[in-house]
Design a protein with these regions (language model features):
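Bacterial N-terminal signal peptides that target proteins for export
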Residues: 1-7
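Beta-propeller folds
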Residues: 8-9, 18-460, 464-465, 481-483, ...
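Serine-hydrolase catalytic core recognition
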Residues: 241-245, 297-301, 306, 437-755
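Intrinsic structural disorder/low-complexity segments
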Residues: 7, 23-24, 685, 721
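N-terminal signal peptide c-region/cleavage motif recognized by signal peptidases
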Residues: 14-16
Length: 755
């Protein structure tokens, strides 16, 4: 009896304590569900990425500046931070700059305010003044005096203005001619006179900026280190075909004419000149050794002793010569060496010079991008880095200690880290700690660097590190509290074997409350183009949230990088050589087959989605395979003869030299084999992959009796940018996905891989 009473009392005590613990336990917050409006609606969009600080520029070894933003992402001021003291100050008086700009005729008060709060500035070499283009003229603003001085006053637009290395002159392009102006006296000098509609001096056309010098980079002149001369490209556009792009929205319709060389068509004729900055006759650097050949000049720079060094490739880019020439009349260039591979060669940037006159050079000759050291005469000294990984970015070298700093993939191809290595190749050390993706901005002495980091679940964060990798301070934690308020599923990174044993990287996002005994539909995103990874342990913003939205609807999200897009060296990208689509499709099929083998996939409800090369790949897959029940193809290339010379011929050669490859790689010629439901999307004024591609494909599908859907977005180029149109497009895509993946599926018996 006593034992029973004690036992009952004990039970009562335990029950009471348990109840108290339940009552005092904090309530787990209810997570919100993502909606399409949260991600894409301009009126209801939520800021998930936070407001990461960016645009950092080192002023010297101890101070850097950046456009500091508030919690809403609005620029507050151009701030300077001293890393030695931790103190901050404004780089200049923003109110004074605004007031000075407002005095310029034609500039409103609102425009003056906006122009005084920019995300990037055109700085002088000493960082004490900036160039501004106001009312189509160039001005220089001096931080110390607060004076805004006009440098030009001629009619016409001035483009691509830059300071000389000594800061005393400014070069610019007007009317496709090259000019300089003296900062102190405002004396203007015209360096070329033959520029016009068909002759471009110091400025690039569409195809050169898009495919060689980088999207948005139009400047094609370069100051010599001593500020005495400029080297510049001249492009003769007379052989290039014009392509018209109509804008149907204006009442009278606007028609844009674009210089666009399609594969196999004539390229612009390129020449390289030098000219004295104070005026004189431009001198052509002779390339007579390539007489009769169609070549490209893909990089130009100067050596430390004021010689011109440039890279030249043949049209199909199977070799690249590094040439050097004196900056004088009738100079004959010397070829330091020729790069070649078993497929194509791409420029990897200019040489980085050492004090002893040697230079560092990036090359993919081994199948992986690595560092090499050369003497100034082109004699190879050594290969500095090697292995089945890549150097992605060469940041520079600390000559005092002979440390080379770079970013690369030695730890992980899906991420990226910052490294250093001795000039002799020894002492390789990873400087970045956390797994994910890192990039770096080093100070001039290479004693410290700003580290930008993110991973697939975490928006960008910024820290200051010493050159040995130890952290000095967190610059911007960017905690993004909004992101934690929503129900998100942790992505899984997996590796998948292709049929020949190649290891592919993939990312998988399963629905919340995933049940492996159930069957789920699959949405697969791809790009597939050479060197264009999609499986990355890095923050991808709205793309990541789009994936999460689909997962929350009960759909498995699958991203699998085929070998040519894997980032695993040029040797993997070369699989696409002469045949776009073939190897990519086999790899994508093998990835999907692996996913289906896990037992939780409904093979009758699978979809492929992509834009640009990914749009091509979707169109190609649905006309060459039956493994996907549906596809969304955006900005698709339907016939590779329609795309530009430089990108296409690099991989496919000229159509005249590879007719079967072009035909077999172009979806329009396989339209009769369309399998599954297809949605085509395209920008009406796309100046990259022209709307013509979709129209040609649609025409072939119609003639073959194939039903499909398509949507054209007016005033949109190679990608839809207008927020209202983006919301419309994503809504259309979501409806198409719901219909095909969450509705009735097709018979899995028809899903067979290609041969």
């Amino acid at each position: 009896m006593i034992r029973r009473t004690l036992f009952a009392a004990a039970l009562l005590t335990v029950a009471t304590l348990s109840a108290q613990q339940v009552q005092t336990q904090p309530t787990k917050p209810t997570l919100r569900e993502l909606t399409l409006e949260n991600i894409f609606d301009p009126k209801a969009k939520v800021t998930f990425t936070g407001t990461p600080q960016s645009g950092f520029i080192w002023l010297d070894d101890h101070t850097y500046t950046w456009p500091r933003t508030d919690a809403e992402g609005k620029i507050v001021e151009q701030t300077v931070l001293d890393t030695a003291t931790g103190k901050t100050r404004p780089l200049f008086d923003g109110a004074k700059l605004q007031a000075a700009i407002a005095k310029v005729p034609g500039i409103s008060a609102d425009e003056a305010k906006s122009m005084s709060l920019q995300r990037s500035w055109n700085f002088s070499p000493n960082r004490r003044s900036i160039l501004l283009t106001l009312s189509n003229d160039i001005f220089v603003y001096d931080f110390d005096s607060g004076a805004l001085n006009r440098l030009t006053s001629a009619p016409g637009d001035e483009e691509e203005a830059t300071f000389s290395p000594d800061g005393r002159s400014v070069a610019f392009v007007r009317g496709n001619n090259l000019y300089t102006v003296d900062v102190a006296t405002q004396r203007e000098r015209q360096l070329t006179t033959d520029g016009g509609e068909n002759t471009l001096n110091g400025i690039l056309d569409w195809v050169y900026q898009e495919e060689i010098y980088g999207r948005g980079t139009f400047r094609s002149y370069w100051w010599s280190p001593d500020s005495a001369r400029l080297a510049f490209l001249q492009l003769d556009e007379r052989p290039v075909h014009r392509f018209t792009i109509p804008d149907h929205i204006p009442y009278r319709q606007n028609v844009e004419e674009e210089l666009y060389p399609k594969a196999g068509d004539p390229n612009p004729i390129v020449k390289l000149f030098t000219v004295v900055a104070s005026g004189g006759t431009p001198r052509e650097i002779s390339n007579e050794q390539y007489s009769g050949a169609d070549f490209l000049i893909v990089n130009v720079d100067w050596t430390p002793d004021n010689k011109v060094i440039y890279q030249l490739t043949n049209r199909e880019q199977t070799w690249l010569d590094l040439n050097v020439a004196e900056a004088k009349a009738n100079a004959t260039p010397k070829t330091l060496f020729r790069e070649s591979t078993k497929a194509w060669v791409e420029t990897q940037g200019n040489p980085v010079w050492l004090k002893d006159g040697s230079f560092l050079w990036l090359s993919e000759r081994s199948g992986f991008k690595h560092l090499y050291q050369y003497k100034s005469d082109g004699t190879l000294i050594r290969q500095v880095t090697n292995g089945p990984w890549e150097v992605r970015t060469l940041h520079g070298i600390d000559p005092a200690n002979e440390w080379i700093y770079f970013s690369g993939t030695e730890r992980s191809v899906t991420g990226g880290d910052v490294y250093r290595v001795k000039l002799d190749g020894s002492g390789l050390k990873r400087l970045s700690d956390r797994a994910g993706s890192h990039s770096a901005n080093f100070n001039p002495a290479f004693s410290q660097f700003i580290d930008f980091w993110s991973d697939v679940e975490t928006p960008p964060q910024v820290s200051l590190l010493r050159n040995d990798g130890t952290q000095v301070k967190v610059i911007d934690a960017n905690e993004s509290p909004t992101l934690r308020q929503y129900r998100l599923v942790k992505p899984e990174f997996v590796q998948v074997k292709a049929r020949d044993g190649f290891t592919m990287e993939a990312m998988l996002i399963k629905p919340p409350d995933f049940d492996p005994s159930k069957k789920y539909p699959v949405y697969e995103f791809t790009y597939s183009g050479p060197h264009a990874q999609q499986v990355r342990n890095a923050w991808s913003g709205r793309s990541y949230l789009w994936y999460q939205l689909l997962a929350n609807r009960g759909i498995i999200v699958w991203v699998c990088d085929n070998r040519s897009a894997s980032g695993k060296g040029a040797e993997s990208a070369w699989a696409a050589y002469k045949n776009f689509g073939t190897t990519e499709l086999r790899d994508l099929e093998d990835g999907l087959k692996w996913l289906e083998s896990q037992g939780y996939v409904d093979s009758s409800r699978t979809m492929l989605d992509g834009w640009s090369y990914g749009g091509f790949m979707t169109s190609y897959a649905l006309t060459h395979s039956t493994m996907w029940a549906a596809g969304i193809s955006g900005g698709t290339v339907s016939d590779w003869r329609d795309y530009d010379t430089i990108y296409t011929e690099r991989v496919m050669l000229m159509p005249q030299n590879n007719p079967d490859g072009y035909k077999n790689s172009s979806p329009r010629f396989a339209a009769k084999n369309l399998h599954g439901n297809l949605l085509l999307l395209h920008g009406a004024i796309d100046d990259n992959v022209h709307l013509q591609n979709m129209v040609q494909f649609a025409y072939e599908l119609q003639k073959a009796g194939k039903q499909f859907r398509m949507m054209i977005y007016p005033k949109s180029r190679h990608g839809v940018g207008d927020p209202a149109l983006v919301a419309h497009m994503r809504g259309l895509m979501l409806s198409f996905i719901d219909e095909n993946l969450l509705g009735r599926g097709r018979s899995p018996a028809t899903a067979q891989p290609s041969e």
